[in-house]
UniProtKB/Swiss-Prot annotation:
The gene is pip4p1. It comes from the Eukaryota. It catalyses: a 1,2-diacyl-sn-glycero-3-phospho-(1D-myo-inositol-4,5-bisphosphate) + H2O = a 1,2-diacyl-sn-glycero-3-phospho-(1D-myo-inositol-5-phosphate) + phosphate. Residues 1-80 are annotated as: Disordered. This is Type 1 phosphatidylinositol 4,5-bisphosphate 4-phosphatase. It is an enzyme of class 3 (hydrolase). InterPro entries: PtdIns-P2-Ptase.
């Protein structure tokens, strides 16, 4: 290969710092000063200007002054659309729900299983069987069966809590000792009729002495009044009773009422009393 092919292009021009100097045998020594080339296109010998090269046009900016940049337009896929899509809960495929938003569930075209798109109706809930069958049942249901003939699985849902768990309320009432069996029980009803049935012996007793005494007095008083009325009726209609047999019936009715009131008074007088021992507030 000739020496001229290894020499750099434009070997007769320098850059003022010694770079790009000629590498031929006629190059000056390192210690000598290098001539400086005149600027391109400036005054100088005509032989220094390259021949046959047109002049470069004036440089223009990439963006024309006073013109706004083009508007931003994101790239969109031609296959993408605005149709609402959901993911299948079984095979994770996309399901087009356009025109089906009024339904509660939609069917997947890949696995043919149902996927809910709305909440269950009031009082209902969705349950998915291990065979991927979507079931709907009551909120309070604890056991349901899969209707598919090849499954027929019984699903235990467990207890259902209608609301958030809250601690049990503290008992409010009166702790009393039964007048019959002497066992303690809690009584929560407070009224003028303070009669309590013991949960142990199932017998009725009174909470305190006030209520049975009041009832006993009223029954005895009413019984005495009825007895006096019966006695007066007997004395006043004694002579007429021989002619009118219905008078005997009136005597009997008054006497029975008097005996019933007196008997009820005796019942209240013999009523067992349960005494309160502790109260909760």
């Amino acid at each position: 290969m000739a020496d001229g092919e290894r020499s750099p292009l434009l070997s007769d021009l320098g850059d003022g710092g010694g770079m790009g100097a000629a590498m031929g045998p006629g190059a000056p020594s390192p210690g000598s000063a290098l001539p400086t080339a005149p600027p391109y296109g400036g005054p100088g010998p005509a032989s220094n200007k390259p021949q046959g090269f047109p002049e470069f046009p004036a440089a223009h900016g990439s963006v024309i002054t006073g013109e706004d940049p083009p508007p931003y337009s994101p790239l969109t896929s031609p296959e993408s659309g605005s149709a609402p899509m959901i993911t299948c809960r079984v095979c994770q495929s996309l399901i087009n729900v356009e025109g089906k938003m009024h339904q509660h569930v939609v069917k997947c075209g890949v696995c043919n299983e149902a996927t809910p798109i709305k909440n269950a109706p009031q009082g209902k809930k969705y349950v998915r069987c291990p065979c991927n069958c979507l079931l709907i049942c009551k909120v309070t249901s604890q056991r349901i069966a899969c209707p598919r003939p090849y499954c027929k699985r019984i699903i235990n849902l467990g207890p259902v809590h209608a609301g958030p768990l809250s601690p049990e309320p503290q008992p409010v009432g009166v702790r009393v000792i039964c007048g019959h069996c002497k066992n303690n029980f809690l009584w929560t009803e407070f009224s003028d009729r303070t009669l309590a049935r013991c949960p142990h012996c199932r017998k009725v007793s009174s909470i305190g002495m006030r209520y049975p005494r009041k009832r006993c007095f009223c029954c005895f008083l009413l019984g005495v009044l009825l007895a006096l009325a019966a006695a007066g009726l007997v004395g006043g209609t004694w002579t007429l009773a021989y002619k009118y047999g219905g008078i005997y019936a009136s005597w009997a009715i008054l006497l029975l009422l008097a005996l019933a009131c007196i008997g009820r008074g005796i019942y209240w007088a013999c009523m067992r009393v349960s005494h309160p021992v502790q109260s909760f507030s």
